[in-house]
UniProtKB/Swiss-Prot annotation:
Binds 2 magnesium or manganese ions per subunit. Residues 33-279 form the PPM-type phosphatase domain. Keywords: Hydrolase, Magnesium, Manganese, Metal-binding, Protein phosphatase. It is an enzyme of class 3 (hydrolase). Mn(2+) 1 binds at D69, G70. It comes from Arabidopsis thaliana. Coiled coil: none annotated. This is Probable protein phosphatase 2C 69. Its cofactor is Mg(2+); Mn(2+). GO terms for cellular component: plasma membrane.
């Protein structure tokens, strides 16, 4: 959610809300499992996107997870989903200086998006909340108000900051650049946009930057899980309440589905997308964190090359008002098959697009 007119974009008439689309998987090294769920909620259109991706880089398994909440249309969020992580993992300093690589990838992706939008005389934008798992490091970056929260030692800890125009440092930056912040239902940049950092937003780019804030956490046996979600969840959940709910459900896909379903029940008026990553430092690779719908277990596999499996390379479903699910043929049958010898056990991967 971002632009002023989006606040009125859903109907007040009773609507049938479909069950969230969901899926998940387990890393081949058994160090983490993940699940996701996504729903248009009460809205007639879907502008949330997400990515769950596991790559083998220099013989090391790397996890990349992201939630992207579009405004002014779905184009920007879809673009960021498709390009951000590809730009990141090809950065020459991705392993050696991950934070610098993330900053460069965010800004490069934004620059390329703006070129695309400008050539078509269009303007759309997107938040991003991303989590990169590299070795024993969790590196979280964000622009906008899609939030990242971890549970460490049983406590909820925000590892991102919502970028809002009324925050003193953000307001000062905007005003120093020649912009202004005014109240229009909530505080907005130029009276229009409710976030102060985002991808895209061509007409406000001088004030609405895509420079990410980055926070790093050590992955150890006190780090239990991570929640990434769009503001459709956080509008009706505190950090503590979300963490408490995930604690009750061992499987990350079921956790994500429960959060999204409960957000709908609580009256969230926005699209809702959630990714849950569980860290399995104390558990073996055969841990039961895989969804109960899958009876397969990860097997030992050959040494890794530069292997990539992402949520948009497996079976995809298009969800939205009036659209039937669309099956997309897997583009990498040799690496993204349903065999237990794959790098990750992917299930029901979803592209949440309208």
């Amino acid at each position: 959610m971002g632009y002023l007119d989006l606040a009125l974009s859903y109907s007040n008439q009773p609507q049938t809300v479909e069950a969230p689309a969901s899926g998940g998987g387990l890393s081949q090294n058994g160090k983490f499992s993940y699940g996701y769920a996504s729903s248009a909620g009460k809205r007639s259109s879907m502008e949330d996107f997400f990515e769950t991706r596991i790559d083998g880089i220099n013989g090391e398994i790397v996890g990349l997870f992201g939630v992207f909440d579009g405004h002014g249309g779905a184009r920007a969020a879809e673009y960021v989903k498709r390009h951000l992580f590809s730009n990141l993992i090809t950065h020459p300093k991705f392993i050696s200086d991950t934070k610098s690589a993330i900053t460069d990838a965010y800004n490069h992706t934004d620059s390329e998006l703006l070129k695309s939008e400008n050539s078509h005389n269009r303007d759309a934008g997107s938040t991003a909340s991303t989590a990169i798992l590299v070795g024993d490091r969790l590196v979280v970056a964000n622009v906008g108000d899609s939030r990242a929260v971890i549970s460490r030692g049983g406590k909820a800890i925000a590892v991102s900051r919502d970028h809002k125009p009324d925050q003193s440092d953000e307001r000062e930056r905007i005003e120093n650049a020649g912009g202004f912040v005014m109240w229009a239902g909530t505080w907005r940049v130029g009276g229009v946009l409710a976030v102060s950092r985002a991808f895209g937003d061509r007409l406000l780019k001088q004030y609405v930057v895509a420079d990410p804030e980055i926070q790093e956490e050590k992955i150890d046996d006190t780090l239990e899980f991570l929640i990434l979600a769009s503001d459709g969840l956080w509008d009706v959940f505190s950090n503590e309440a979300a963490v408490a709910m995930v604690k009750e459900v061992e499987d990350p896909e079921d956790s994500a589905k429960k959060l999204v379903g409960e957000a709908i029940k609580r009256g969230s008026a926005d699209n809702i997308t959630c990714v849950v990553v569980r860290f399995l430092e104390k558990k073996s690779a055969s841990s039961s964190h895989i969804s109960s719908s899958s009876s397969k277990e990860a097997k030992e596999m050959p040494p890794l090359g530069d292997l990539a499996i992402s949520s948009n390379e497996a079976k995809q479903v298009q969800i939205g008002s009036g659209n039937k699910p669309e099956n997309v043929t897997n583009r990498k049958p040799d690496t993204a098959s349903r065999s237990t010898d794959t790098l990750t056990l992917e299930r029901n991967s979803v592209t949440d697009k309208v």
